[in-house]
């Protein structure tokens, strides 16, 4: 993206454009679940799977792949996302999409030399959402659904969430996914499947 600090490309080519690659719902889950990364027992299997794909594409197109797990310092994926899609902040500290709700994620970005500088003006313009999603939501059920009130609307109480997951009463969240996230009425058709949701919840609990 124009004006962003992007890494140098192979052979001294100019970094012209940044492509974001991600998932909607559980569209990528089957491919990941069947990969050796999911079964090898090593840490961070989804990050390693994403890196294998991103790095392969970077080699194919002569670009450089960037990942959310590269930091610190972290790449500004959320800022990039808001410039590419009509995303908005939500009370759950996640970006909400008007169609997909909270059920989307960026797996990597590809810095590419494929476009000429004159083609960048349209890509650099921020995407403006049509209307506020969460402020128009009746009652904001996401803020009431968490059993330990980990979300205040202004902050995420990580310690309270993690402690709950390590208790017997937290097993519903482990098995079905975050109750606050599932309470959001936007994008319900894209909710993560049970195995996908449990994978992320176990990964979170394992690091806290």
Specify the residue positions occupied by each region the protein language model found.
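Non-catalytic, usually N-terminal nucleic-acid engagement modules in DNA/RNA processing proteins
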Residues: 1-55
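Catalytic cores of enzyme domains
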Residues: 42-208
């Amino acid at each position: 993206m124009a004006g962003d600090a992007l890494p140098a490309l192979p052979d001294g080519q100019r970094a012209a454009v940044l492509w974001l690659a991600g998932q909607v719902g559980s569209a990528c889950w089957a491919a990941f679940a069947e990969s050796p990364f999911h079964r090898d027992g090593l840490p961070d299997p989804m990050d390693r799977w994403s890196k294998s794909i991103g790095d392969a594409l970077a080699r194919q197109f002569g670009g450089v792949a960037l990942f959310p797990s590269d930091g610190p310092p972290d790449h500004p994926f959320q800022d990039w996302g808001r410039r590419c899609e009509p995303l908005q902040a939500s009370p759950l500290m996640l970006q909400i999409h008007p169609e997909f709700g909270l059920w989307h994620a960026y797996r990597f970005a590809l810095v590419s030399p494929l476009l000429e500088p004159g083609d960048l003006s349209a890509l650099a313009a921020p995407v403006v959402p049509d209307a506020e999603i969460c402020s128009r939501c009746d009652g904001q059920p996401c803020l009431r659904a968490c059993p330990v009130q980990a979300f205040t609307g202004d902050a995420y109480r990580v310690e309270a969430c993690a402690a709950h997951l390590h208790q017997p009463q937290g097993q519903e969240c482990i098995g079905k996914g975050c109750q606050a996230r599932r309470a959001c009425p936007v994008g319900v058709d894209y909710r993560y499947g049970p195995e996908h949701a449990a994978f992320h919840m176990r990964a979170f609990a394992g690091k806290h």
